[in-house]
Amino acid sequence: YLHRRHEAGDEILFEGAQGTHIDIDHGNYPFVTSSNPTAGAASVGSGLGVTTVGDGEVVGIVKAYLSRVGEGPLPTELDGDADEEALADDIREKGGEFGTVTGRPRRIGWLDLPMLRHAARVSGFTGVAVNHVDVLAGLDDLKVCTGYQLDGEEIDTVPTTTERWERCEPVFETLDTWESFDSAAVAEGGYDALPEAAREYLEFVADEIDTPIYAVGVGPDREETVELTNPFDE
């Protein structure tokens, strides 16, 4: 069926779940799932050849901060003191960061660009959609991890072993914060309706990972999305 649709010239969308860093081959083993949540699984799972699937767009989905379920390295985790834990609680509540089935609170951290660079490289992102930008509104401080310190050396992507990753210390860049905004109004007004500091945040991320922003989630509803590039457009 998929081969016929492709040969007829139809567009086909494959949607993955979970995340790069719990990929059984490319994640931080043994803190992984049993499958491949990376883009290569689209070919294996669908039966379409890699040259067919690889000829299209690959849009990475990322939150404006970091969350994780379960164990494993998380260098930017907000758990160092009472203030960090309070901030993590605030982000967790605003972002609904609880397990869908178990209700277990997810671990929260600042956006980790080394992790995002690794994800972009492994899956070959042509663009990213950044969600939960509204959740970071109203913070007193805003940080992004741009690299790690490991054994006296600064690196810009995740190391090759989990043991080395566990020893990494984050290198942070502090960015301007933005005030809360009306999600529906921003979705209607488009990208320029976002607060200036939010746009600067997104552009900083895009520059750091050398990947353009395709869409921005500014609220919890599907309609509260700002589209910059539609991969289905010719």
Residue spans of the language-model regions?
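Non-transmembrane, aqueous-exposed alpha-helical and coiled segments at domain scale
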Residues: Y1-E234
